[in-house]
């Protein structure tokens, strides 16, 4: 009888250990895509500062200059793409 109880206890302890290991590895796998996306879309503070110095497409250009490749629309005061029909 003692051997049966010991083997049942060891089996139960093994199943609990297996559950803990599987849960830990699954939670790491769930965090991996989040970490990957955050590293892909991470932006340096220097780049953010440069981006704030000029106004991008469809941004107000009253106080800021438009970024390169855009011009300030005289009518709407937005940064737009330069075109032959725009004055």
Curated annotation (Swiss-Prot):
Which SUPFAM superfamilies does this one have? omega toxin-like (SSF57059)
The signal sequence is 1-24
Task: Alphabetically list the UniProt keywords.
Answer: Disulfide bond, Ion channel impairing toxin, Knottin, Secreted, Signal, Toxin
Q: List the disulfide bonds.
A: 54-67, 61-72, 66-79
In terms of superkingdom, the source organism counts as: Eukaryota
Q: What is known of its domains?
A: The presence of a 'disulfide through disulfide knot' structurally defines this protein as a knottin.
> Which protein family is it in?
Belongs to the neurotoxin 10 (Hwtx-1) family. 51 (Hntx-8) subfamily. Hntx-8 sub-subfamily.
Protein name, per record: U3-theraphotoxin-Hhn1a 17
Origin organism is Cyriopagopus hainanus
């Amino acid at each position: 009888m003692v051997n049966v109880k010991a083997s049942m206890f060891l089996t139960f302890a093994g199943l609990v250990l297996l559950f803990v290991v599987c849960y830990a590895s699954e939670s790491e796998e769930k965090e991996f895509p989040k970490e990957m996306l955050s590293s892909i879309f991470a932006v340096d503070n220097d780049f953010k500062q440069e981006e704030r110095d000029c106004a991008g497409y469809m941004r107000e250009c009253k106080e800021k200059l438009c970024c390169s490749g855009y011009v300030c629309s005289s009518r709407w005061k937005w940064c737009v793409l330069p075109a032959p029909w725009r004055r």
